[in-house]
Regions:
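Intrinsically disordered or low-complexity boundary/linker segments at protein termini
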Residues: 1-20, 108, 113-169, 174, ...
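A short acidic, amphipathic alpha-helical/loop segment
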Residues: 24-26, 96-99, 126, 167, ...
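Short, aromatic/basic amphipathic alpha-helical patches
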Residues: 68-75, 126-127, 192-203
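Structural beta-alpha unit
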Residues: 77-109, 119-122, 204-242, 246-249, ...
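Small/aliphatic-rich secondary-structure junction motif
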Residues: 2-54, 150-204, 209
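Intracellular, membrane-proximal regulatory regions of polytopic membrane proteins
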Residues: 31-104, 114-115
């Protein structure tokens, strides 16, 4: 059952190698929002294995899950946010993440790129529809560690860039990150671009960070400049980013070539939120 301890930031865990980075990100966001952290270990069971058979091996699964969730609790202790843990056995992979987010009334979900692709042993027919109707904010980290020393946030505005800004603010205020904003414009639009970025930064509580306005191709510019940062936070420019992630397409080719860690941010559209409230289409 959902708790009443403020907004819930759910972190979906499936790999011990990425647990620390995901909890560090989710913990910073939970503290920033004055909410709680929900660590969920989703154990994806192959289709050929029944859930009953998997449950019969529960002792082994419980040990593995207990170790992973204990590590999550330890890492979460660094943040001023209460933490809860859960383990779920499922054939449905990514669908289970959406169900858990809805069941627990999550305000945001943090997961790894590899975890976002755990589709179980079958093709998930409703995947596109599922990923285009997000139940809450989604953050997908491509990288096994989170170094929040220097963070770059490219922006052209929009709801998902608003989420990127909130994450950057959380990492700055909670984890001590140094944040830079990047806005890429066409030739001859540098002045208007700087005016836009200055106003955008002020409106998102980031008026004191480094502002960069570049005139070039957007993807190539993010690739070139992003290499100098520890983390690049990229907001979705259209609905369905998560659908592409699950199918193995991280983002643009330029983003995929980045050696640094990338955090993909997608915020539900107003239409999706309205549909959640009225329960229809």
């Amino acid at each position: 059952m959902p708790s009443d301890d403020g907004p819930a930031v759910m972190v979906a865990l499936s790999n011990p190698r990425t647990e620390g980075a995901l909890v560090a990100l989710a913990g910073a966001l939970a503290e920033h929002r004055g909410g709680r952290l929900l660590a969920v270990h989703i154990v994806t069971v192959p289709d050929q294995t029944s859930l009953e058979t998997a449950a019969a091996n529960r002792e082994r699964l419980d040990r593995s899950s207990a170790d992973l969730l204990a590590a999550a609790v330890d890492d979460a202790a660094a943040f001023d946010a209460p933490v809860e843990t859960k383990t779920v056995l499922s054939h449905r992979g990514i669908e289970e993440v959406f169900d858990a987010a809805r069941t627990n009334d999550a305000d945001a979900v943090v997961m790894g790129y590899g975890g976002a692709r755990f589709a179980g042993g079958r093709a998930e027919g409703s995947l596109d529809e599922l990923a285009r109707d997000l139940p809450c904010d989604f953050l997908v980290l491509d990288g096994q560690r989170l170094d929040a020393g220097e963070v770059l946030v490219p922006t052209a505005g929009g709801p998902s860039s608003d989420l990127s800004a909130e994450v950057a603010l959380a990492l700055r205020d909670v984890s001590g990150a140094e944040v830079s904003l990047l806005h890429v414009v066409d030739e001859g639009e540098a002045a208007s671009g700087r005016e836009f970025l200055t106003d955008w930064a002020d409106g998102h509580g980031l008026g004191d960070v480094d502002l960069r306005v570049e005139t070039a191709d957007v993807g190539a510019t993010i690739e070139r400049i992003g290499e100098g940062y520890d983390l690049v936070v990229v907001g979705a420019t259209e609905r369905g980013l998560l659908s592409r992630v699950v199918r193995g397409s991280l983002a643009s080719a330029a983003i995929q070539r980045l050696d640094t860690s990338v955090l993909l941010a997608e915020r539900p559209s107003l239409r999706s939120l309205r549909e959640r409230l009225i329960g229809g289409r």
